[in-house]
Amino acid sequence: NLPYAFCEQIGKEIRDISDELPFEIPDSWEWVRLGSICEIARGGSPRPIKQFLTDDPNGINWIKIGDSDKGGKYINETKEKIIPEGMSKSRFVHRGDFLLTNSMSFGRPYILNVDGCIHDGWLVLSGYQTAYDKDFLYYLLASSFAYYQFCEVVSGAVVKNLNSDKVACALFPLPPINEQHRIVAKIEELLPYI
């Protein structure tokens, strides 16, 4: 038993991860692996995509990187839709889920304000709501702290890609939910001055 050791259990093995922790956090906070508090999955693309696109306004939203604004927080609409048959070759995501770009300009987070399907240039993070306030998680994922962790695990010589398993292993601080709300309020109070 090490004093003040931070341990995690993987299978039956318990190991000290104190050396992996980048900084100290308050006693009421804890360190978590992103994959332990949410589901992380990669999108998929029906191919050839042109066979699955539709002009039908009732089609399924086809969420592409181009539907996001660099520096924006939300994806509110899509430019294209796909037919229902495309869903089985893609990944359906829900309003409130997080999307994370996983190639080229990797690691950019967005909160979904629409349901739809995502292609393989996205990772989806869902089921985080029991641990994180969505706005706190957004600011955490948009931070240089998160970006540097992603830079350490990105693969590819020319086109950089984030792997969902590597993202799941990223360590993040988890404050109590009431502290998350206070932190978000302070960030949003100060943002106009930055």
Regions found by a protein language model. Name each.
Residues 8, 14-20, 35-52, 66-95, ...:
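Sequence-specific dsDNA recognition surfaces
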Residues 1-6, 187-194:
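Short amphipathic coiled-coil heptad-repeat segments
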Residues 40-44, 108, 150-152, 156, ...:
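Conserved helix-loop functional segments at active or binding sites
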Residues 64-66, 77-144, 153-154, 163:
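A short beta-sheet element
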Residues 31, 70-72, 107-109, 192-193:
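Flexible loop/turn segments at secondary-structure boundaries
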Residues 15-45, 173, 177-184, 192-194:
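Non-catalytic DNA-recognition/assembly elements of restriction-modification systems
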